[in-house]
A protein has these predicted regions:
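Conserved, well-structured ligand/cofactor-binding cores
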Residues: 1-154
Length: 154
């Protein structure tokens, strides 16, 4: 668990000590790894990161993009062009209709992203190696989940 060693070493240097010092205050396995496993902490960290990115950045950007496409749909509702399919000319349509198709795709993508938020809110923390919670303190999972919820405003 290299990450535990990295975290321990960072804490050690933040205390003003050198990495070559053998007496480390924060031990990689006894302190950093306490009550968790890479099988629950990494998926939990990934869910938190994805949750924040999707909710705070991706969804707002796509909502703005969707509004722009709707505006373009109206702006070009009377501009007729040739539709294309299979690299060939097809039937006429308006440029507004084409933008409508793009807007529809973004709308469906937004719906899928919003649905994913609930799934990303499910955390593996506290499950340890095989999901049993073995070697964790009582209520570890709920305590950590509450802290994460408070920090992420979820």
């Amino acid at each position: 668990m290299n990450l535990n060693e990295v975290i321990s070493n960072i804490a050690h240097t933040l205390e003003g000590k050198k990495l070559i010092d053998s007496n480390k205050t924060l031990k990689p396995n006894d302190d950093v790894n306490k009550s968790q496993s890479s099988n629950d902490s990494f998926p939990t960290a990934m869910h938190i990161a994805a949750f924040k990115l999707v909710k705070e950045n991706v969804i707002p950007a796509l909502e703005s993009f969707h509004k722009t496409l709707i505006a373009k749909e109206k702006e070009f509702e009377k501009d007729v062009k040739i539709g294309r399919t299979h690299l060939m000319d097809a039937t006429p349509l308006t440029l507004g209709q084409e933008f409508s198709g793009y807007a529809s795709q973004i709308k469906h993508g937004l719906k899928s992203l919003r649905n994913s938020i609930d799934h990303l809110s499910e955390l593996a923390i506290g499950g340890t190696a095989v999901g049993t919670g073995l070697n964790t303190s009582p209520n570890w999972d709920t305590t950590v989940a509450k802290y994460i919820a408070d920090e992420t405003h979820k």
